[in-house]
Structure formats: structure tokens, C-alpha cells
Swiss-Prot record:
Subcellular location: Cytoplasm
Matching InterPro entries: Aminotransferase_I/II_large, AspAT/PAT-like, NHTrfase_class1_PyrdxlP-BS, PyrdxlP-dep_Trfase, PyrdxlP-dep_Trfase_major, PyrdxlP-dep_Trfase_small
UniProt protein name: Aspartate aminotransferase
The keyword GTP-binding belongs to this UniProt entry's keyword annotation: no
Entry's family note: Belongs to the class-I pyridoxal-phosphate-dependent aminotransferase family.
Protein origin, superkingdom: Bacteria
E.C. code: 2.6.1.1
Cofactor requirements of the protein: pyridoxal 5'-phosphate
Principal subcellular localization: cytoplasm
GO biological process: one example: amino acid metabolic process
Reactions listed under catalytic activity: L-aspartate + 2-oxoglutarate = oxaloacetate + L-glutamate
Length: 392
């Protein structure tokens, strides 16, 4: 029989986050008391008014195809959101709605990358960036942002990484997995290098609404019209409105790129789920109280978990400013407990301490683990106690 699989998928690395989450769920199904700190989604239910909007749309018969790039009403809601939150002006032909921000990113790389084009990715990175770039024929080029620099790349690092094959750089702020937020000044320095070298900026802003202790979100596209023209902004309702399962994300930027993405989407998904689009319209046009309530809950959890995690022997923790993750360096704790690697340490936490965390190797940071505080405070505190006992 001929080889069944294409070469391009043979080097794919399965999503670490989804794999650990699945293993934890499997253990729970066996009756094991597992506490999951690996979740990449809010633990709150979608607000009722948003669910009602989806139900109403179906009852009114809105169950057919929509335009491939999204409902005009949803595009308009997104345009108003950009005006309100980011002081950015976009036209409908500069917006595409897709099946979650992940799929929007995938579609973007498919339409902008030729074989061998390079995309600069800061380390630590979200697990899907390198895989999506490779699937589009691109080459990931990594810049390591250390804990000493708060896990944020510098303009000088970016400048040194650019070659004649560089097509784009990814900026994720607030960041998954670090929770760090770039300042306006840092983004201005990065944008200057991108403009000088004529490379596209891919700005992933999905955690925009989850900011703590006075941190402020600033979109790199806000710097100037020139920067905006060279930036594709990625966002969605998954994290801000606790709608991960609804699968609605979007991109805003250059009309030619957006048009190409829309053409590709017409052959891959037809359109995002119709009811989900109506739910997203309500998410942006309806009351925003729940967004702030969820943010406050995450902030409260962070203030509880950070000092306790920092007190565990061998844990070095940089306090995050956004998202709902911490990324402690636990190499010392792993060594202290007799493990050859942090991956083995993380695996033992699951099988022996019944706490699920994500090994940092999946994010390009093998000395770390990612801990999510998108779960109840009681469970978080119990999980930290288990980790503390395990290490001691």
C-alpha cells in the first residue's frame, strides 16, 4: 500500500495542552481525584444573554449558511468594538470572522506564506504557532525571551533575527503562556524594526480583556496608520466572554490578505457556525458586566496563587500581568525530587500527586510548567498544597 500520510503532517507535534487535559479527564473518569491546572479556557459558563441570543436566532430560523467571512452584523459589531476599545477604524472588507482565533491564524499563515518563508516566534510561545507555520510551508525562527526580561522580546533581538526570508513576526500580548503584557513603548520599538524591514506583524490579542494590577492593553496597530497597515490583529470572544466552545475568532487588517483568507475559508469551512455568530453579536453589543466580573475573579485567584506558588522550594515565578496562567521555572524542584527533566516532573505531578499541569517544553521553555488558574480558588489552593507536599 502507498504511504497514507502526507509528509507535512509527519512532523506535527500534538497539542500538549489538549493531550494533558485529555489524560486528566481520563483519570477523573476512572474515579481518581485529579485537579486540573492545565485548562486553556475560563471555567465560567457563557453569560446567559449570549446563550439566549443563539437560541433566539435558531428559533427565528437563522440556521442556514452565512457569508464565508462572517455575518455583516457581526463584522459591524467587531468594527464598533475596535473603535470603542482600541480607537481603531476598520472597514467590513478588512474583517474576517472564522471558526475561532486558532483557525483564523491557520488561515492567515496559509495565505501569506510561501515555501521557506520565515516567521519569527518569541519563546515561550503558544503551542500552535510553530505547527501552523510549518503546515503552511513556513519556517519558525525563534527568539528566546528569558524570565530576566519578563518573557518579552526586545527590538534588538527582533532586528538580529530578521533575514531576507522573514515574512512576519508574532506578538502575543497578553501572552499565553507567560501572562506578560507589552508596553506601548516596547511595541513602538518592535514596530519600528518591522516597518524598516517590511515584515508583517501578527498581533494575537485574544487575552486583551484579562489584565491585572493596573496593566493596560495597547494594540500595536494603534501606533500609527503605517503600522496598522502592516499589522493583522487576531482576537475573538473565547477568553473575554467565556465562549471557547462557540468557536468565534476574527482577524482585522489588510483588505487583500483578508480577501484571500475569506476565499480560502469558503473552501474549508463555508462559514463559522451561524448560531455562534449571533451569540458573538450579543457578546459585543450586549452588557459587558460579566467580562469585568470574570476578570476580577481571575485577578483574585492570581493574588492568592502567586505568593503560595513562589514559596514552594525550587519554584521561580514571574508574576503575570494578564491572561490566566503562570509559568514558573521548576528545574530546581525537578532536580531536587530526582527527575531528569521537567517533563518527567510534570508527569509525576499528574500520576502521583494527581495535579495536571502543562510541561513547558510544549511552549519552547523546557525548564518551566504552565499553571492555569482558570478553576475554582478552593481547587487551586488544594492543588498547590499537593504540589508543595510532592516537592518537599
Amino acid at each position: 500500500m502507498k504511504e497514507l500520510l502526507a509528509n507535512r503532517v509527519k512532523t506535527l507535534t500534538p497539542s500538549t495542552t489538549l493531550a494533558i487535559t485529555a489524560k486528566a479527564k481520563e483519570m477523573k473518569a476512572q474515579g481518581i481525584d485529579v485537579i486540573g491546572l492545565g485548562a486553556g479556557e475560563p471555567d465560567f459558563n457563557t453569560p446567559q444573554n449570549i446563550m439566549d441570543a443563539a437560541i433566539d436566532s435558531m428559533q427565528q430560523g437563522y440556521t442556514k449558511y452565512t457569508p464565508s467571512g462572517g455575518l455583516p452584523a457581526l463584522k459591524q459589531a467587531i468594527i464598533e468594538k475596535f473603535k470603542r476599545d482600541n480607537q481603531l477604524e476598520y472597514k467590513p472588507n478588512e474583517i474576517i470572522v472564522g471558526v475561532g482565533a486558532k483557525h483564523v491564524l491557520y488561515t492567515l499563515f496559509q495565505v501569506i506564506l510561501n515555501e521557506g518563508d520565515e516567521v519569527i516566534i518569541p519563546i515561550p510561545y503558544w503551542v500552535s504557532y510553530p505547527e501552523q507555520v510549518k503546515l503552511a510551508g513556513g519556517v519558525p525562527v525563534y527568539i528566546e525571551a528569558t524570565s530576566e526580561q519578563n518573557y518579552k522580546i526586545t527590538a534588538e533581538q527582533l532586528k538580529n533575527a530578521i533575514t531576507d526570508k522573514t515574512k512576519a513576526v508574532i506578538i502575543n500580548s497578553p501572552s499565553n503562556p507567560t501572562g506578560m503584557v507589552y508596553t506601548r513603548e516596547e511595541l513602538e520599538d518592535i514596530a519600528k524594526i518591522a516597518l524598516e524591514n517590511n515584515i508583517l506583524i501578527v498581533s494575537d490579542e485574544i487575552y486583551e480583556k484579562l489584565l491585572y494590577n493596573g496593566a493596560e492593553h495597547f494594540s500595536i496597530a494603534q501606533i500609527s496608520e503605517e503600522v496598522k497597515a502592516q499589522t493583522i490583529v487576531i482576537n475573538g470572544v473565547s477568553k473575554s466572554h467565556s465562549m471557547t466552545g462557540w468557536r468565534i475568532g476574527y482577524a482585522a487588517g489588510n483588505a487583500d490578505i483578508i480577501n484571500a483568507m475569506t476565499d480560502l475559508a469558503s473552501h474549508s469551512t463555508s462559514n463559522p457556525t451561524t448560531a455562534s455568530q449571533y451569540a458573538a453579536i450579543e457578546a459585543y453589543n450586549g452588557p459587558q458586566d460579566s467580562v469585568e466580573e470574570m476578570r476580577k475573579a481571575f485577578e483574585s485567584r492570581l493574588e492568592t496563587i502567586y505568593p503560595k506558588l513562589s514559596a514552594i522550594p525550587g519554584f521561580k515565578v514571574v508574576k503575570p500581568q494578564g491572561a490566566f496562567y503562570l509559568l514558573p521555572d521548576v528545574s530546581e524542584a525537578a532536580q531536587k525530587t530526582g527527575f531528569a527533566s521537567v517533563d518527567e516532573f510534570a508527569s509525576a505531578l499528574l500520576t502521583e500527586a494527581n495535579v495536571a499541569v502543562i510541561p513547558g517544553s510544549g511552549f519552547g521553555a523546557p525548564s518551566t510548567i504552565r499553571i492555569s488558574y482558570a478553576t475554582s480558588l478552593n481547587l487551586i489552593e488544594e492543588a498547590i498544597e499537593r504540589i508543595d507536599r510532592f516537592v518537599k
